[in-house]
């Protein structure tokens, strides 16, 4: 993943609530799946394996975040396991059909979680993070972001 993507995900994480964080994890998984496909088409098998390993780590994070006190978690768990197994098969076979099927499952779940996140108006997880203002200034070819009121103690409050 490129450094610019990492910065974008980092900024999004610092501004999101619990529901938004799940959506961001899906987006990170999609970024690594795209990277894996690009590596495979470029015959970079090591990069392919590494990207899929990181995508699987994202799915692992989704699995760890399940709360089995809710019925929906019992339905999500087998889907996440299916996706992990499809990724593992893709590494072995070097064929993208399993990965494409896994991606379809994840896209449907991403859409559902995105809709749920739109209805979640809870406060951001990181209460003491810098505020990011986009659209205040523009570069020649891109939108610049402005950070306001830098503080020394940012992030989670203990």
For every predicted segment, state its role.
Residues 1-67:
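N-terminal leader/targeting segments and the first structural element of proteins
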Residues 56-74, 110-121:
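Short, charge-rich amphipathic alpha-helical segments embedded
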Residues 42, 69, 93-96:
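Residues at alpha-helix boundaries and the short loops/turns that link adjacent helices
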Residues 29, 69-81:
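Short, well-ordered alpha-helical segments
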Residues 87-103:
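Amphipathic, charged alpha-helical scaffolds that flank and support histidine-based chemistry
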Residues 49-53, 74-78, 99-104:
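Short, charged, amphipathic alpha-helical segments
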């Amino acid at each position: 993943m490129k450094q610019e993507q990492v910065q974008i995900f980092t900024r999004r994480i610092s501004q999101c609530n619990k529901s938004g964080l799940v959506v961001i994890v899906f987006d990170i998984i999609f970024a690594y799946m795209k990277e894996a496909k690009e590596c495979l088409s470029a015959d970079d098998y090591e990069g392919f394996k590494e990207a899929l390993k990181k995508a699987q780590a994202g799915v692992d994070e989704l699995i760890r975040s399940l709360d089995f006190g809710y019925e929906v978690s019992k339905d999500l768990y087998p889907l996440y396991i299916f996706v992990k197994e499809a990724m593992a098969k893709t590494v072995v076979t070097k064929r993208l059909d399993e990965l494409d099927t896994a991606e379809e499952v994840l896209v449907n779940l991403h859409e559902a979680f995105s809709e749920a996140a739109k209805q979640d108006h809870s406060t951001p997880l990181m209460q003491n993070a810098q505020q990011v203002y986009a659209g205040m200034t523009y570069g020649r070819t891109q939108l610049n972001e402005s950070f306001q009121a830098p503080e020394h103690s940012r992030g989670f409050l203990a």
